[in-house]
Amino acid sequence: MARGCLCCLKYMMFLFNLIFWLCGCGLLGVGIWLSVSQGNFATFSPSFPSLSAANLVIAIGTIVMVTGFLGCLGAIKENRCLLLSFFIVLLIILLAELILIILFFVYMDKVNENARKDLKEGLLLYNSENNVGLKNAWNIIQAEMHCCGVTDYTDWYPVLGENTVPDRCCMENSQGCGRNSTTPLWKTGCYEKVKMWFDDNKHVLGTVGMCILIMQILGMAFSMTLFQHIHRTGKKYDA
């Protein structure tokens, strides 16, 4: 009976972590594709030049893939050492997430202030040769979100010249429209637009966050339960 429960739990955890591992592989693949095809796409911050969309997705994908692999191997081998490692990794990730969320809300005003300042400094690199990714990112976000600059369109004046903005700031986009002072422009800054997007989608984001939290807790529960079952049935392991 105990052995049957152990087998059932083992394969449930293996399947759970196999899905986890496949998701990690998918994220890693997307990150590598972004890195190869888009270069430094979405590198907005001059203070953190490595914090691009590609690098972020690669890092998350790698963590998810390694964690899933630990869980799969620990379950199928019934190895208490690997199961404990899997539990500790998930616990560290969970604690790191909670600490980051708490710090974000405690220092929200400071985060907003520094983010705006850093993004404005990043605009100065818009036309530099080594920052094509930053230029692409700003062009896309301004066109898609109907915004201009960080706080408003005047953020571009010190970068491109008086009364000059990127063409994607124009309500009716056309070649050279950003140099025409009479062209209607998007007035709202992109920072405010992004904040509005997060506010409009907070329920969806909250649901996604809750699902991730539940998956992490389930993974920890599966690993500890399997760990205890192996211990009770006297299963030995290789350290």
UniProtKB/Swiss-Prot annotation:
Topology of the protein relative to the lipid bilayer: Multi-pass membrane protein
Q: Which InterPro entries match?
A: Tetraspanin/Peripherin, Tetraspanin_animals, Tetraspanin_CS, Tetraspanin_EC2_sf
Q: Give the transmembrane region(s).
A: 14-34, 56-76, 86-106, 204-224
> Where does this protein reside within or beyond the cell?
Membrane
Q: What Pfam families does the entry give?
A: Tetraspanin
- Chief location bin: membrane
The organism's superkingdom is given as: Eukaryota
* Ranges in the topological domain labelled Extracellular: 35-55, 107-203
Q: Which residues are glycosylated?
A: 180
Q: How does it assemble?
A: Found in a complex with GP6.
Q: Record's family?
A: Belongs to the tetraspanin (TM4SF) family.
User: What name goes with this protein?
Assistant: Tetraspanin-9
